[in-house]
UniProtKB/Swiss-Prot annotation:
One of the primary rRNA binding proteins, this protein initially binds near the 5'-end of the 23S rRNA. It is important during the early stages of 50S assembly. It makes multiple contacts with different domains of the 23S rRNA in the assembled 50S subunit and ribosome. Forms part of the polypeptide exit tunnel. Residues 63-72 have a biased composition (Basic residues). GO terms for biological process: translation. Keywords: Ribonucleoprotein, Ribosomal protein, RNA-binding, rRNA-binding. NCBIfam families: rplD_bact. Transmembrane segments: none annotated. This is Large ribosomal subunit protein uL4. Part of the 50S ribosomal subunit. Gene3D superfamilies: 3.40.1370.10. It comes from Anaeromyxobacter sp. (strain K). The keyword Nucleotide-binding does not apply. SUPFAM superfamilies: Ribosomal protein L4. It comes from the Bacteria.
Length: 206
């Protein structure tokens, strides 16, 4: 088990938390990051790109000139791909770029990302963070005190006040613990978890 300091919102140590080495202090595998982030970015692509081929371009039904005895190359339509205004040959079509990554690989990559933030001392665990009302300025002050200005804050989805407080901060975001992913961990400088969230991650990733 690895020991982690637990802080209050002013970064005063209030206790310690034992968490599984396999989840928070394991090996960092950068290749898993590549596989999972590549799949995430691929699934985010809209895939709506499309061009018109010769059957979709309007016009061109009439043969431009007779087949023989003109001295010119034979042509069947002014909408063939070699003509200006013609259809595109073998152009892009709408497609789905998403593909599945095995669940074991996704979990291993998430464990590796947590271990990376822990190794870099960019993982901050707070006892709890439950603002009474959404206050962006207050959230900015807390993150500054924690030394995590551009941070990903993770807690229960029900903590709407915290979500609204953090989402307006430049460079910081809030995620529900169920939606935590490698891509969002890596694109933020620091990771802030509540003690309950850390325990939930330990249980789900062990």
């Amino acid at each position: 088990m690895a020991k982690f300091d637990v802080y209050d919102l002013s970064k005063k140590k209030v206790g310690e938390l034992d968490l599984a080495d396999a989840v928070f202090a394991g090996e960092v595998n950068e290749h898993l990051f590549y596989e999972v982030v590549k799949a995430k970015l691929a699934s985010d692509r809209s895939g709506t790109h499309a061009v018109k081929n010769r059957s979709l371009v309007s016009g061109g039904g009439k043969k431009p000139w007779k087949q023989k005895h003109t001295g010119r190359a034979r042509q069947g339509s002014t909408r063939a791909s070699q003509w200006v205004g013609g259809g595109k040959a073998m152009g892009p079509k709408p497609r789905d770029y998403s593909y599945d990554v095995p669940k074991k690989v996704r979990k291993a990559a998430l464990r590796s990302a947590l271990a990376l933030r822990s190794k870099d001392q960019k993982l901050v665990i707070v006892q709890e963070w439950k603002p009474g009302a959404p206050k962006t300025a207050a959230a900015a002050k807390v993150l500054a005190a924690l030394g995590a200005k551009k941070a990903l804050v993770v807690d229960d989805a029900a903590n709407l006040a915290l979500a609204k407080s953090v989402r307006n901060l430049d460079g910081s975001d809030f995620l529900a613990v169920e939606g935590l992913n490698v891509y969002d961990i890596l694109r933020h400088d620091a990771l802030v978890l509540t003690a309950d969230t850390a325990k939930k991650l330990e249980a789900s990733l062990s």
